[in-house]
UniProtKB/Swiss-Prot annotation:
The modification Arginine amide is found at R64. The keyword Ubl conjugation does not apply. GO terms for cellular component: extracellular region; host cell postsynaptic membrane. It is found in: Secreted. Keywords: Acetylcholine receptor inhibiting toxin, Amidation, Disulfide bond, Ion channel impairing toxin, Neurotoxin, Postsynaptic neurotoxin, Potassium channel impairing toxin, Secreted, Signal, Toxin, Voltage-gated potassium channel impairing toxin. Residues 25-39, 65-76 form a propeptide. One of its GO terms (molecular function) is potassium channel regulator activity. This is Alpha/kappa-conotoxin-like fe14.2. Highly inhibits both nicotinic acetylcholine receptors (neuronal (alpha-3/beta-4) and muscular (alpha-1/beta-1/epsilon/delta) subtypes) and the voltage-gated potassium channel Kv1.6/KCNA6 subtype. Residues 1-24 form the signal peptide. The cysteine framework is XIV (C-C-C-C). Belongs to the conotoxin J superfamily. The keyword Secreted applies.
Length: 76
């Protein structure tokens, strides 16, 4: 049975790849209709990545502060 951590990582990876495909203006990515939807879903994923401490993987998200490894809280 897969662990919660591995399932969470798979879900996050899938979401990151999905956002990469629908981000308007990115070179070599698909352009879907409804660009407002693409931006809002990207924003939601960025917020989640920042909260989980993975914002450093996506500099375009502009996360502020660094994740404190010991307490898992954001240090500004």
């Amino acid at each position: 049975m897969p662990s919660v951590r591995s399932v969470t990582c798979c879900c996050l990876l899938w979401m990151m790849l999905s956002v990469q495909l629908v981000t308007p203006g990115s070179p070599g990515t698909a352009q879907l209709s409804g660009q407002r939807t693409a931006r809002s879903s990207g924003s939601t994923v960025c917020k989640m990545m920042c909260r989980l401490g993975y914002g450093h993987l996506y500099p375009s998200c502009g996360c502020r502060g660094k994740r404190d490894v010991v307490s898992s809280s954001m240090a500004v």
